Amino acid sequence: MRKKRVFEIAKELNMESKEVINRLKAIGVEVKSHMSTVENHHLNLLLKALNREKEEKEKKEQEKKQVEQKAEAQKLQSHPQRPKEQQQSKQGGQSRPREQRSDRPQGQRYAGNQRPEPRDKDKGRRPGEQRSFNQNRPRDDRRRFDKERGVQGPKPFGEKKERPPFPREKKKGVLPAIPKPEAPKGENKEPERRKGAPDKKREWEKALKKEEKVFALEEKKLNLKKEKKQEKQEKQEPVAAEPKAIVIPERMTVQEFAKIMGKSAAEVIKKLMSYGILATINQEIDADTATIIATDFGYEVTVEKEEKEDIWLLEETPDDPESLEPRPPIVTVMGHVDHGKTSLLDAIRQTNVTATEAGGITQHIGAYQVEHNGRKITFIDTPGHEAFTAMRARGAQVTDIAILVVAADDGVMPQTVEAINHAKAAGVPIIVAVNKIDKPNAQPDRVKQQLTEYGLIPEAWGGDTVFVEVSALKKIGIEELLEMILLVADLKELKANPNKPARGTVIEAKLDKGRGPVATVLVQSGTLNVGDVVVVGLTYGRVRALMDDKGRRVKKATPSMPVEVLGLNDVPSAGDILVVVDDEKTARTLAEKRQEQKREEELRASSKVSLEDLFKHIQEGKIKELNIVLKADVHGSVEAIKQSLSRLSTEEVKVNVIHSGVGAITETDIMLASASNAIVIGFNVRPDSNARKLAETEKIDVRVYRIIYELLDDIKAAMAGLLEPEQKEVVLGRAEVRKTFKASKVGTIAGLYVLEGKITRSAKVRVIRDGIVIHEGNVESLKRFKDDVREVAQGYECGLTIEKFNDIREGDIIEAFTIEEVKRTLE
């Protein structure tokens, strides 16, 4: 028999899951939630405990009922038995023969003023009987008033005689009470009661017996029902049909779930609604919810864990120490913008890269390999601009040694500190290159002093950080710097296994018009050959060609060698891992699964709506958005610009990059911008002729930049244009009310004397009385000597009326002002 879950047990026992959990814990069974499974022997223990409790409860209730019944019976026995006494009195009166009454002489009944003696309480009464003081006895029991016999009857109606509760002494001369007739011998019968008179005691006894029978019958039925239920369970348990087993993923839509169970989506939605979940066929449900619903439909559920197929690709297997061979060190050049990183690399490579960069600022990551004393060194040049934080971090992650370039005339700057933090976070040794020492205002010692604050203490001062003074322009200290790099590399004993499938990191990626997607990859282990099938993030492909940093074709790339890879189906993201796989089918499957997984995550993130989100969306309706379609030549630039733009967003204006990509601006980008009311920004790319024509037709703003500073400044200006202008009040003048005049058609006219400034016809005015503003409004008319005027200057008198306001009094101050709108700027 299969194990049951807590919620199933709760449903069968008609209890709450929480109560079942508490009961299980009470008998020593640990369960965590309503989805926990319970062993069969634990379930039997729980059922026994519950049955025991139920039986005890029923027993207590039965005992309680019996006690109540006994108490009721005792109560009835202790009360005066009025019905029986009345019957006896009636029967005694009726059974007495009339002859006895008539045969007795009348004179013997009452002598003179004597009255009949009242019956003694103890005479003529059975033991245990009490006297009834009921004055409303039956009429036959009363003594009648007989004029002929001289018998005194009861007093007239309404005159009740109170009888004393205790017996009194017998009066002399009163006849004894009439004896009760004896029953015939041999018969022990109760006196005959009057025909039609109810026997209350018998009726009560009958009712009591009937009630006891009903209770006994109900108890019998209850026990029978319980026995039948137990028999039914015992019969059903051995032959219970095993539920159908289904396998469900961790996440799926309602429609997919219904299909797995072979049910209609409407049935599943109805069942979800019964649990208070409102869902459409395209909404996702989690595995826990699906398990509960499937169990209700009679299915045994197994949740299939989503296997991350690419985990085995990302985890590197340890290499045999014998297979490791020395590899060139990977050196990252980092530092603040314009401190001479690329110039230093030019001096090392003996080329002129700086001239090719826009504005002399590195916009992309560059990877190069140089040779010194027969040994190779790989250099990675990262941008110093603040927008390229992610690219610097990525450079630090793949590197062995970091060269921190600091200008001797400028000192430590913000990006210098950031570069230090990235290198320390990656656990990379730092070599400080103090550049521009050839300048007259160079202060290398000041740079060293500043860097000690960040834990970089020169070896000459007793620290462990290598400092080299260089001049990229004059090529001073270059040889010494390379020697230090090789020395630090030797200390680290850098090795890799070249005899296995390659694994590397994408440093940069772009879409080349003639060559298609191109990825700059730094091989970290193994050897990458032409013809290898690779998976790179969400993309895959077969390596069509490999190009080194000088643009020459190579057949293979060994560890620590930067190469450009051609042959991918799409442009990968910078930072993606390149892994060689067995065949193209495997590569395609993995890439497609990764794409699907990413798409599901994006859909999941966008489809989840809570009340808090709803309120947020309502509030966001008041926020203005600047939509942007961004295109750049390389992926690193796209990433950097997106990060910089997101930092520009304020509470009032939000920058929203609705689409970003690598490559030229196309018609699709223009159409997207037209549909979403966006502007198109190109960084180092231009629109083609068709896109330009479409932009002119649709009146889409297309802007192209080569330097990131200019791009960010223009976006700030555009955002400032979306801000609501500030309203500023400008006071024009003040005037005092010297006299007021009433006019039937006009209302109250204020005679003013301008104290300061001027009062204009187009201005707004406020009426101030005793320092309190009592009204604000517009000027209806402004006159001087019965002539309409545009304004009245200081020191002059005028007449003024205010729109829809006549409560003007002498001594009031009239203040004229205007509201000016001031253009706001982004702070």
UniProtKB/Swiss-Prot annotation:
Segment Disordered: which positions? 49-205
Outline the extent of the tr-type G domain: 326-495
The entry's keywords: Cytoplasm, GTP-binding, Initiation factor, Nucleotide-binding, Protein biosynthesis
- Pfam families with a match to the protein in the record: EF-G_D2, GTP_EFTU, IF-2, IF2_N
For region G3, the annotated ranges are 381-384
G4 as annotated region, ranges: 435-438
Q: Which GO terms describe its cellular component?
A: cytosol
The cross-references to CDD domains, in alphabetical order and at most eight, read: IF2_eIF5B (cd01887), IF2_mtIF2_II (cd03702), mtIF2_IVc (cd03692)
User: Which GO molecular function, any one, fits this protein according to its record?
Assistant: GTP binding
Binding residues annotated for GTP, in chain numbering: 335-342, 381-385, 435-438
Question: Where in or outside the cell is it found?
Answer: Cytoplasm
Q: Does the keyword Cytoplasm apply?
A: yes
- Which intervals carry biased composition (Basic and acidic residues)? 50-73, 96-106, 116-129, 137-150, 157-168, 182-205
Superkingdom is: Bacteria
Predominant cellular place of this UniProt entry's protein: cytoplasm
Provide the function of this protein.
Answer: One of the essential components for the initiation of protein synthesis. Protects formylmethionyl-tRNA from spontaneous hydrolysis and promotes its binding to the 30S ribosomal subunits. Also involved in the hydrolysis of GTP during the formation of the 70S ribosomal complex.
Member of which family? Answer: Belongs to the TRAFAC class translation factor GTPase superfamily. Classic translation factor GTPase family. IF-2 subfamily.
Under what name is this protein listed?
A: Translation initiation factor IF-2
The organism named in the record is Carboxydothermus hydrogenoformans (strain ATCC BAA-161 / DSM 6008 / Z-2901)
Q: What is the lineage of its organism?
A: Bacteria, Bacillati, Bacillota, Clostridia, Thermoanaerobacterales
